[in-house]
Amino acid sequence: MYNNAEGAVKIVGSLLSSQDERFEVVVSDDNSRDNVGELLSGIHDERFKYFKNEKNLGAHKNWEHSLELGKGEWLYLIMGRDIIDGGSVSNLIGQLIKARENNIVFLKDDSRKCKDFKISEGIDAMIDFIKYNHPTGCIFRSDLFGAIPNRTRYFEISDMYPELYVIRDMAMKGKCAIICSGVNRRFMGSDLVKVKSSVECGMDISKTYFSPSRRTRQFFEQLDMVESDLQGVFTLSELDRYFKERYVFFLENVSYWWRMWNKDPELMAHYGQPIRHVSIREMARNIIQGYKDTTVHLKEKGTYTPSRRRIMLCITSWAVVRLCTKSAIKSVLEPLGVWKFLHRIRHRGNIQA
């Protein structure tokens, strides 16, 4: 948590409103400059602990630090921009007890239609996680999190959400559960999310910037210009391979970072950078370059292998292969505008039939 006194007080207050005694609330303050310490110091509850870093660690390192501070059986990472329903905590704990044999639990937020409790493992679990990808909503087994070798490097090299690497590591070692708890939803009125929860007004996903069809359309409008900017970074065929491997994460990162650079000075300050106008084209180019730099970094450290790369990155390609037929693939990609793009590149001779 950083410079978000109002959000921290709301989250802590909501959680501690629960009468359940089987959990603790730990706040890791990344050396905030606001009055969050003063406000939280007035909370007297044995379930609550407040820590302030002596220096600013940055978002990723503070996430790791906050998870290390937790002493319970499960670790639940909560972001300062989310709303937590303290009245549902007991229900969540009961479901976690049932899910004890699992390595990770993914929580659907209350703006999504909830289905039955689901168990998956390995690559299936990783694919499921794509659908519910958000840091708030991932609950880790604390013993397994602590046992991840060289865990710190995940928080050093990640360009966005380091818990993705942690989750992939755990998913490949055991079962994962997806449950609907009604505990969390994304903060209403923030710069990153413009659509209120279905609990408040009903959700029309087409109105939000994160709508897949919207961000895909805007992204592909820029692709011709992106291609000319990629000289010396990626060839077009390499871009295609990268796109197929990281389709979901690529588009998500472009849209998230574009919104953050242009609209969110508070969050950018947490990353030590000023707000400035950035085009979607520039974001696409920067993210591709960042992916290339990360790959080089892993190779230099001796932690990069083709097999590990396939496990960590080729999630969507594997999912598409499972559809088996060209017509099935087309039926999925065509509404998103992706099929037209792949067809165009193929006829340029960059994709083999």
Indicate residue ranges for each PLM-predicted region.
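A conserved acidic beta->alpha catalytic loop
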Residues: 29-38, 55, 79
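Glycine-rich, basic loop-to-helix element that forms the pyrophosphate-binding segment
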Residues: 53-70
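Conserved nucleotide-sugar donor-binding catalytic segment
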Residues: 120-209
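Short aromatic/hydrophobic "clamp" motif used to bind/position activated sugar donors
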Residues: 75
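Acidic helix N-cap motif at the loop->helix transition within catalytic regions
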Residues: 7-9, 34-42
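Conserved donor NDP-sugar-binding/catalytic core segment of glycosyltransferases
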Residues: 83, 87-118
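Short, acidic, metal-binding catalytic loop of nucleotide-sugar glycosyltransferases
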Residues: 13-22
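Membrane-proximal basic amphipathic "stem/tether" segments
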Residues: 269-353
